[in-house]
Amino acid sequence: GDVSIGKLSGNINTIKHQISLLSGNNFWLTVWAENKAHCDLAEELGFCYVGPKITTYGEVHAIYFKSNSPIPRSFPKVESTEYLSIKKIGAITSEFIESVSAKLATLPAFTNHYSNYNKDKAWSALSLRGYRPESDFITKPSEMSDDWKEKNKDVKFELQDTPLYDMFPEVRELLSKYREVHRVRFMQLKPGGGELERHTDQVDKDSGGSKGKLARLHIPIITNPNMIFTVWDTKGTPQKVHMDVGDLWFLDTRKPHQAINNGTDNRIHLVIDAISEGDLYESLVS
């Protein structure tokens, strides 16, 4: 018997009146989290914030509930890491950065990353570890479209190192401290306004910071002060971050994020997907 309101629009007083006509019901209310007026209205009308809902289009919705029943309604506890969007969790030695960056010029051409959010083909990558032995295969099969999966149904996909990985023993040594490592890639963003548009990686059901999930880690190898990451938290609040060379960052790619390189140099990050366990998990919850 619950009533669900999926969107608010119109004059605030009109909205209040319409909701008052349904005062005998239990309510679920969804509002755009970045619309502070509607969030404030929900609280004014006695709704309790339950949590966020994030869409594949990068929208953050706030879910509210109001009970008109004598029976209390409970909701499951959400782990703290689910509310984490981005966090600096460590630093990498300058020797590591210098060793890796010196080899980047010897690498083959980076592969354009097929994505609706990479319309200008500014974002590209190379694989050190992925689902095929070829370094130019940079995708995760489970993220791809049904048409792609049908066309590639006879191809065997399994996690494996590519030949490029042998060029970077320092990367292998660094990642040996993690209990389980999935994809390892160099990701490049072109200068002069190269942009990865606001989006979420909701299609990857394995990702996140919770224990047992795939945590996305970024280590900037080459960057510049005009390279800015913007992330949106679960309340829809934006945060602009510059990841400096040698920083180690966690990024929850299920949350909206955007990258723009307004500098004059390519940005290259070492990007790792590792299972959130042990010290890695502790660094996220501490």
State each model region's role.
Residues K7-L21:
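Conserved acetyl-CoA-binding loop-helix of GNAT-fold acetyltransferases
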Residues L22-W32:
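Conserved GNAT acetyl-CoA-binding A-motif
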Residues T30, C48-A62:
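Conserved catalytic-core motifs of GNAT/GCN5-like acyltransferases
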Residues A33-G51:
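Conserved active-site alpha-helix within GNAT-family acetyltransferase domains
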Residues P72-Y178:
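Non-heme Fe(II)/2-oxoglutarate
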Residues A215-P220, L248-F250, T264-Y281:
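A short hydrophobic beta-strand segment most commonly corresponding to one strand
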Residues P220-D244:
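A short beta-strand-loop-beta hairpin characteristic of the jelly-roll/cupin
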Residues V241-P256:
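Conserved metal-binding segment of the jelly-roll/cupin
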